[in-house]
């Protein structure tokens, strides 16, 4: 529907003292707010108000859609393959560079559902399969290094539209949290087995499925912070089989329902972390084949982190860099299990 964003509009600026990266994305200031819209661009029948879809479910366009994946009209990063940087003399200014990547939106229901708890189960599961397919596509591009998912649900979590949706990003660098997680295990070749075992011993497991364990974080940044961890090692979500993807969708909905009962009205974020697309140097995989697992600890696993927004981030969190939780991990788990 819309023209590709100007590649100059999205940049990454680096703080020279901390090394912290900041994405400058002027188009984000134009994101519409729910209260300012006459019609919702994500509802069925309003497809002309969004960019052309990349993926849909079902794939047959003769059938009504249940979930759609579309380019974000107000991106954080710009795909320079479709919006190339203009040729300008000289090197980029010190301290910043173009923000290259892919930024998509996953519309999780054709109805104007405001909560994932009211989305029809087939549509909800289909939205996760679209995300998996899209990450699988992007992993084959040699200009992208990492990809993941995130959701903002509610105003306190950063959502501007109520219609249920999540977002997918693929970047040309590995985000600092992923670097830190890969390094945190040290010599532990299977850190997630230990994480699950300790959670079981400390009674922090909230719920389980055939393929996943939902546990309260050992160091929650907010009360009720919950992680969903696969039982079996696997660094990439886009390699997950259909039963794992469907099981993840169902378990996410169960945990969000528990959070809603334990803290009614709480907004929340979640994000899915996985390993870099190509995690080691060496020969590239054959065309059409997924990148190798090398360079990632054998037991490393993609996982989902759900963070309720119960307390605001204040000066201590922002200035000191540490979080404060008013509820212990064990108490959070007891509360979630009890509702």
Q: What is each of the regions a protein language model found here?
A:
Residues 1-163, 169-237, 243, 256-261, ...:
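Active-site microenvironments that recognize anionic phosphate/pyrophosphate groups
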Residues 252-253:
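Functionally critical, mid-to-C-terminal surface segments that flank or help form catalytic/ligand
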Residues 271-273:
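Domain-length cofactor-binding catalytic modules of enzymes
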